[in-house]
């Protein structure tokens, strides 16, 4: 997912980072959240892990890191990878617009439908 986003989004205003490129493969959610919070920039974290918002340690880490999170919906995760990426890229302008309107910590869920609305999440 990160490689596709990188090809689509990298420009002078944006940078896409795959966590596997900067952290060990066994890094925990709390580890990567801490890493991102220490890096400069206005991050939008894209994740397939819906549980990051339901486990208390990860939720506390997200709140203290003051990140913006985009979670893939369960319905979206059932689609083939290329369909997931097509929807993510198609919805990206909406994602950026929505994230610009909320103070971190904040989160949205990306729907599986082409015309689906982003669902704001409690972070």
Annotated model-derived regions:
Residues 95-123:
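Charged phosphate-binding loop/patch that engages nucleotide di/tri-phosphates or the phosphate backbone
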Residues 1-30:
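Long, hydrophobic N-terminal alpha-helical segment
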Residues 29, 36, 40-61:
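Acidic, metal-binding active-site segment of PIN/NYN-like and related structure-specific nucleases
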Residues 22, 49-52, 73-78:
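Short beta-alpha junction loops
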Residues 2-8, 56-64:
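Short, aromatic/basic amphipathic alpha-helical patches
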Residues 65-99:
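Ser/Thr/Gly-rich flexible loops in soluble cytosolic domains mediating phosphotransfer, phosphorylation
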């Amino acid at each position: 997912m990160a490689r596709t986003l990188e090809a689509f989004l990298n420009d002078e205003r944006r940078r896409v980072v795959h966590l596997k490129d900067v952290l060990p493969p066994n890094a925990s959610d709390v580890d990567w959240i801490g890493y991102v919070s220490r890096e400069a920039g206005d991050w939008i974290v894209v994740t397939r892990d819906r549980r990051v918002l339901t486990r208390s340690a990860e939720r506390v880490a997200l709140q203290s890191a003051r990140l913006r999170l985009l979670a893939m919906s369960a319905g979206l995760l059932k689609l083939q990878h290329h369909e997931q990426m097509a929807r993510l890229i198609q919805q990206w302008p909406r994602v950026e617009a929505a994230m610009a309107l909320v103070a971190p910590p904040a989160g949205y869920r990306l729907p599986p439908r082409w015309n689906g609305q982003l669902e704001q999440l409690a972070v």
